[in-house]
Amino acid sequence: VYNWGEYISNGSDDSVDVVAAFEKLTGIKVNYTTFDSNESMYAKLKSGAANYDVVIPSDYMVAKMIAEGMLAPLDYSNIPNSQNIDAVYRDPDYDPTNAYTVPYMLCTTGIIYNTTMVENAPTKWADLWDEQYAGNILMFNNSRDAYAIAAFKNGTSINPETPEEVDEVVETLKAQKPLVQAYVMDEIFDKMIGGEAAIGVYYSGDAITMIDDNPDLAWVFPEEGSVLSVDCMAVPATSEHKEAAEMFINFMCEPDIGKANAEYIGYTTPMQKVWDILDEDLKYSEIAYPSEEVEAKEKVFTALSDEVNSELDVKWSEMKSYDEGGSSLLFLALLAAMVALACFNIWRKLRKKTRNQY
């Protein structure tokens, strides 16, 4: 099983150990590993470096993987619990008739901030370009989510159709880069909980976890809109244990297992039967289950053309390596200081030698 980090109930904090429960029920041994972005997951599967039986990509990546023949059609006779998925999440654009995937969880992007370090609560994505937060901003370390934030700020589509659109939005990210402390994924947990940064961007379910660990943290859905993602369970075309994989997916759709996962990770369940039995705090959480006003502004990712996707990969890498001369200037300053120190030491030795001659 290849899943996002921090994305399953694992037995800690008195939670259910879902993997162990599946192993006990079926006798099937699960090798469980994690990834931190759709792109890293895709790259690993595409390279053939590892073979997995269950993966959990997001909607736009599902569409890409289906188009490239990377996913196997599901045998729903092995997944009867898929009927627990609400009808609204069936037959999606990214996987018509759900031939290849079963929804696992939903999430929305937003801003998390430390109320003791931020004087005025942020209200929009554009606040992440405010110089008052210089050195205290955490940004997504993946191209699609970071691009979407800049696109929201610019008032353009989060799904670019031309390389020129990509170039324009990445320039906006480049302008922000001097203000960014770090580009992160799961590293955000330690940084925000530990008060190492004032403001960051991440996913709604993880925000609930961070706020539970540090009550000084707060969350906001920016007024420009947010990205709504559906993370799905799927079986790679290269799987050697497809029936066992489908048994695992079926197990994850059990209401009590769905409840355990939703309560542990804080994400939004696609199953009404799970929502009905959730703890009250999560059931009525405005982060996990936002208002209709927030939902009306949500956008979803779609798969990009190969040309646009390639342009985004290239421009994202260039942006990440761009330092506006800052690193070069720092290197030159350090080099000058080292030369000056060396010259000073040579002068002292010569002066001492001269004195000793007298």
Q: What positions do the PLM features span?
A:
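Short beta-strand->loop
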Residues: 72-83, 101, 215-227, 236-239
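Mature extracytoplasmic/periplasmic domains
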Residues: 236-296
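Ligand-binding "clamshell"
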Residues: 66-73, 93-99, 209-221, 283-286
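Early extracytoplasmic/lumenal segment of secretory-pathway proteins
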Residues: 1-64, 190
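Ligand-binding pocket segment of bilobal, Venus flytrap-like solute-binding proteins
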Residues: 138-142, 146, 150, 158-222
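Short loop->beta-strand "edge-of-pocket" segments that line small-molecule binding or catalytic clefts
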Residues: 127-141
